[in-house]
């Protein structure tokens, strides 16, 4: 049973085992009974106290061919086209649609290397580099514990690697859905960069990435033309995995990341040699938004990387994927939705409004602070979900004022104030409201197109 917060998608799996010993038995049998996820502690106690052991209703079960004991899926998932394969990634095979895939960047020190403000980020990173260099010269430097160390950074220190601040390493990234932040992109100060130095080129404005959460309790997908953080779609376990349109060799030359094998499979199935690799990229993005696909393969998507089915009317799905891609990547340039802004005066004893950043879905409102509320948010805007939150809720969560966990950041660099970004957030919410409504129109067309 899952315990935790259903709304936030956080939970822990709890199991109670009854082990029955029988010296005369050959082999073993496993019997299983489940309680509804997110049942609270009191209800679980009542469940056990109100049932006799023999009345709990255990079911005898066996693992399927993939080793899954529970939540077994009875569908054609294994027969679909594999999007990725570890052997293909390692150059030992070719049977996957994408050559490379990568986890999002895992910096190990987000508060040090991410920020809404480029100037604030520069200050933090210069301090970080300074302490690192002082520790490099003197292992007993008294201030060494002022920065966040991890295994990787300690390893680079042991290798005597010198560092200096480089302004050009500050780039825009997709930190969370519809939330861009500046990132100091650096091999040594970003704990795990995975494949990003092979799939990102700051001078190539044409590359795009499909990000999805693999192994999470709620599936989500988004596209970006920026570096993507590991936690972008991280809800209830799993990890954010990214599929690039292009990859790069050591000289920086662009290479198609969709394989010739993948192109051949799809062209052959549809008997259409005009299908391109960009078509396949857009088709993939559309399929991953299809509610029927998510419903049919719900159990598979909780533990496996998605696979690609062959839908009728291939080019219609390509077009839907292209429209979604343009909406989700260019969200800052879409027309803002016509929301109603209501401002009330501050109370006499208040100097500044207190940030709230709360959504009231029932009333169709977003309460930004003591002064400002956005009204008339259409109901379909709440339906565009990315994991366990809708797009608007992701924005509200990221712009809340939170005390930094790192003590040095809290003491020296805690400069974020919602008031400084309020008008920017209002504009962003209006535009992402448009994105949400238009996205749901396309998703509803997908649903109506299938029997």
Task: Outline where the language-model segments fall.
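Sequence-level detector for compositionally biased, low-complexity segments
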Residues: 1-451
């Amino acid at each position: 049973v899952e315990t935790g917060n259903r709304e936030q998608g956080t939970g822990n799996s709890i199991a109670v085992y009854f082990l029955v010993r029988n010296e005369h038995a050959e082999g073993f049998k496993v019997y299983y009974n489940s309680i509804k996820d997110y049942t609270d502690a009191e209800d679980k106690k009542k469940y056990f106290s109100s049932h006799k052991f023999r009345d709990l209703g255990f079911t005898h079960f066996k693992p399927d061919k993939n080793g899954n004991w529970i939540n077994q899926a009875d569908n054609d998932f294994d027969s679909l086209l594999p999007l990725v394969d570890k052997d293909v990634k390692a150059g030992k095979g070719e049977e996957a649609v994408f050559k490379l895939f990568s986890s999002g960047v895992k910096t190990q020190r987000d508060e040090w290397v991410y920020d809404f403000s480029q100037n604030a980020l520069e200050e933090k990173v210069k301090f970080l580099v300074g302490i690192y260099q002082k520790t490099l010269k003197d292992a007993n430097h008294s201030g060494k514990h002022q920065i966040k160390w991890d295994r990787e950074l300690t390893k680079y220190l042991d290798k005597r690697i010198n560092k200096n601040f480089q302004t050009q390493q500050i780039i825009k990234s997709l930190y969370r859905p519809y939330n861009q932040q500046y990132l100091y992109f650096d091999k040594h100060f970003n704990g795990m960069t995975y494949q990003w130095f092979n799939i990102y080129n700051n001078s190539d404005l044409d590359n795009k990435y499909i990000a999805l959460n693999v192994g999470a309790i709620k599936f989500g997908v988004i596209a970006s033309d920026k570096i993507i953080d590991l936690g972008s779609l991280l809800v209830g376990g799993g990890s954010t995995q990214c599929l690039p349109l292009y990859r790069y060799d050591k000289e920086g030359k662009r290479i198609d990341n969709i394989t010739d094998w993948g192109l051949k499979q799809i062209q052959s199935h549809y008997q259409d040699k005009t299908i391109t690799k960009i078509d396949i990229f857009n088709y993939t993005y559309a399929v991953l938004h299809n509610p029927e696909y998510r419903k049919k393969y719900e159990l598979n998507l909780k533990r496996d990387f998605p696979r690609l089915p062959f839908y009728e009317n291939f080019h219609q799905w390509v077009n839907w994927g292209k429209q979604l891609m343009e909406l989700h990547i260019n969200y800052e340039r879409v027309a803002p939705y016509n929301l109603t802004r209501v401002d009330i005066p501050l109370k006499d004893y208040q100097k500044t409004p207190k940030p709230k950043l709360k959504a009231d879905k029932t009333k169709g409102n977003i309460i930004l602070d003591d002064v400002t509320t956005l009204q008339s948010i259409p109901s379909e805007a709440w339906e565009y979900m990315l994991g366990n939150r809708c797009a608007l809720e992701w924005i509200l969560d990221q712009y809340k004022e939170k005390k930094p966990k790192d003590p040095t950041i809290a003491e020296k660099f805690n400069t974020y104030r919602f008031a400084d970004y309020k008008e920017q957030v209002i504009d962003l919410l209006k535009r992402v409201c448009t994105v949400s409504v238009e996205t749901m129109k396309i998703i509803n067309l997908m649903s109506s197109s299938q029997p």
